Structure formats: structure tokens, C-alpha cells
Design a protein with these regions (language model features):
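Catalytic cores of Mg2+-dependent Asp-rich isoprenoid enzymes
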Residues: 2-190, 196-287
Length: 287
């Protein structure tokens, strides 16, 4: 039984489920995705959830690295075989024996892959498959980052490439043109902030994304350098859904950097909502 990407009541249910899972997994991205127009919303939600599905494998506390690599490569190969959808059991063989261990968002990857409109869905499958392969490589090396080039390689693989995908989604939706080098910086900058925020927790599980000899100040500098590209990327966007989307994670990333520099562990929920309200107020005045 094959399921194409169709618009209908089933797709409405899938969209509702996707937004609910999104809300449970990431408030940071739930808000900007929830304000996107129909069509683009499904595409960006599909991309986010497919990538979150593989990210949950990469970060899974109960799986060893060899198992992570095996699961990630199985997902990649399944996505590469997509034609006009995926059989109901397409991903099951790859998950066999791990169904009760994996996160709900991971087990639901088939549904997320079918959420985007069919004219763009294969681009999301492509990006997710490539990212899963890269994650498998990093799992096998236990995420050993020795140099800044290693860090650039990692942040491109799991985030800079997301910036490239978003650029393709904006162009697909309404023809918006963007600078792809800045798009990579957008992804890398957000990822560098995550690395800073999660550094202590990562060390506890035996993973260190800091290049050898780097301090938090060095990673701050790396994050700010990439966020300068992210700022150029965001500022170049015309008024519209792409700008509305990008402003929110960009603003929260800068807010998180400032909070970390001032000794806080992260932004509080009230900080997040205050920053977003400020952004909305500015946009309302500008419109």
C-alpha cells in the first residue's frame, strides 16, 4: 500500500499531528513554523521533523554508536528509494528491534516525509538522507572534533545544510532568492549556540564538540562570526514568510549567546516569549 502526498482530510490530520509533535519537541521552532502560510508550513514542518527524527537517534542515550550509525544509514537508504511516497512498512525493517527504544518523532519519520507537498518533498528526502549519512559518520568517530575545520565540517553537516534547504524552500514557495554562503552561516551559527548551551551535558556523555584547546570564549567568537552571516542572510530577505520565520530562531540564538556570556545556563521560557513579543511588536510597527 503506497501513500502519495495528497491534500485531503488525511493530510489535515497529519498536519495537526505534526504541529503537536513539533510543539512537544521544540518551542523554538514551533512558533515560527506555526505562523507560516499553508503549503510552506507543511514543507518546513516536514523538513524539521524528518531531521529531528534522525537527530534523536544521534543523541539517543541508550544506543551505542555502531547501532546509531546502522539505524541512520537504514533511514538514508530508505529515503533514497522514495518515488511518489513510501510503503507503510518502508522504514520498519530498519527499525526492527528498536521500535520501543526510539523516540516517537523518529518512529513517525514516514509520516513526516509525506507531509510536504509532492512538488518539494523529494528535496527534503534528499537533505535528510544526506544528513543521516553524515551523522552516521560522526557517530562512528564518536564526534571527535580536533580542529576548527572539523567543527566547520560537523556544523555544516547537521545545520549549515539545513540553511541551504531552507533557501530552496523559500525559492520553491515564492521565488525568494538568497545568498547560499550566508545560508550556511545561518545554520552554523544556530548550531554553535546549541553546542555552547549543551556543552556541560555533552561532556557528561563523553562527547566534546569544542576543537582541542578551545574555551567557551573561542566558541562564542565562532558563533558570533557565523551569526554575522545569519544576520546578513535574514536582513536580505524581503518582507514575507521567509523573513518572519528566520527572525525568530536568529533572535533567540543571539539572546541565548548573551545569556550564556552573562553566566546563565540558557534563556528561560519567559525570556523566549519576551524576545518573540518584542520582535512581533517591531514587525507590527514596521508594517
Amino acid at each position: 500500500m503506497w501513500c502519495k502526498n495528497q491534500v485531503g482530510s488525511g493530510n489535515m490530520d497529519l498536519r495537526r499531528d505534526a504541529l503537536q509533535i513539533l510543539k512537544e519537541t521544540s518551542r523554538t521552532f514551533y512558533i515560527p513554523i506555526s505562523i507560516l502560510p499553508p503549503g510552506l508550513q507543511e514543507a518546513v514542518a516536514s523538513a524539521y521533523l524528518c531531521m529531528r527524527a534522525i537527530d534523536e537517534i544521534e543523541d539517543h542515550p541508550e544506543l551505542d554508536n555502531a547501532t546509531k550509525a546502522k539505524l541512520l544509514r537504514a533511514i538514508s537508504l530508505t529515503l533514497q528509494a522514495g518515488v511518489d511516497g513510501f510503503a507503510l512498512d518502508a522504514f520498519s525493517a530498519g527499525f526492527s528491534g528498536y521500535e520501543n527504544t526510539l523516540a516517537e518523532v523518529t518512529v513517525g519519520i514516514r509520516e513526516w516525509s509525506l507531509l510536504a507537498p509532492e512538488t518539494i518533498a523529494p528535496r527534503i528526502w534528499d537533505a535528510t538522507a544526506a544528513m543521516a549519512d553524515r551523522m552516521a559518520y560522526w557517530a562512528e568517530t564518536n564526534w571527535k572534533i580536533y580542529t576548527e575545520s572539523d567543527l566547520d565540517r560537523y556544523t555544516f553537516g547537521v545545520a549549515g545544510a539545513v540553511g541551504l534547504l531552507l533557501s530552496d524552500l523559500w525559492t520553491w514557495y515564492d521565488g525568494t532568492q538568497t545568498n547560499r554562503t550566508q545560508a550556511i552561516g545561518f545554520g552554523r551559527g544556530l548550531q554553535a549556540v546549541n553546542i555552547l548551551r549543551n556543552h556541560t551535558e555533552d561532556l557528561r556523555r563523553g562527547v566534546d564538540f569544542f576543537p582541542e584547546g578551545w574555551s567557551a570564549a573561542d566558541m562564542q567568537e565562532y558563533a558570533r562570526r557565523n551569526l554575522a552571516l545569519a544576520e546578513a542572510y535574514t536582513n536580505s530577505l524581503p518582507t514575507g514568510p521567509a523573513l518572519d520565520f528566520c527572525q525568530i530562531p536568529f533572535t533567540l540564538a543571539y539572546g541565548t549567546l548573551d545569556a550564556l556570556a552573562n553566566g546563565k545556563e540558557k534563556l528561560s521560557r519567559s525570556d523566549v516569549f519576551a524576545l518573540i513579543k518584542q520582535l512581533i511588536d517591531v514587525n507590527v510597527k514596521a508594517s
